Regions:
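Hydrophobic beta-strand anchors of alpha/beta hydrolase catalytic cores
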Residues: 65-66, 97, 145
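Short active-site neighborhood of thiol/selenol oxidoreductases, capturing the structured segment around
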Residues: 55-74, 83
């Protein structure tokens, strides 16, 4: 009899835990999916190359140019001088280029210092890959650039060179 009571208690406890877990997951999914992909992307936290935790939405520019890249990607490296020049031509209050590196912190730091990158570079890791997918990079290729206007609307997506 004692074994039956223990079994029923464990079964009820397991059912209760599963219920709470499912309620939590469904609430989390509901909260996430009530926002647009752009709004969700702007809230993703990344480390910058100075070790600060930042979100893409922290930059006040009217236009954000998000460039997903890696140091091992030759087409990515060809784009970077163009992005550096593009940032020089536009004030950061109006337009901000943000590099989201899908690479190690050390490689990103070495590359940006050696190539005089004049815009912020964030350490993307798997969150960067997820964000790129969320913003339309369904193939997973690099480089991938997204232009976001007023933190609300994707106005351009560019895959590859």
């Amino acid at each position: 009899m004692k074994h039956i009571v223990n079994f029923l208690c464990k079964r009820n406890m397991l059912a209760l835990l599963v219920t709470f877990f499912c309620a939590g997951v469904s609430t989390h999914l509901y909260l996430d999916w009530t926002k647009s992909p752009v709004k969700r992307a702007l809230e993703v936290p990344f480390l910058d190359l100075n070790g600060n935790l930042v979100e893409v939405g922290d930059w006040p520019a009217d236009i954000l140019v998000l460039n997903f890249w890696a140091t091992w990607c030759p087409p990515c490296l060809k784009e970077i001088p163009l992005l550096v020049e593009f940032q020089k031509e536009h004030p950061p209050k109006k337009l901000q280029v943000l590099g989201i590196g899908i690479d190690s912190e050390l490689k990103l730091r070495e590359f940006t210092l050696g190539n005089k990158v004049n815009y912020p570079v964030l350490i993307g890791k798997s969150a960067g890959i997820d964000m790129a997918y969320e913003l339309g990079n369904f193939s997973g290729g690099l480089p991938f650039t997204v232009v976001i206007k007023n933190k609300e609307q994707i106005v351009k997506q560019i895959e590859g060179e």
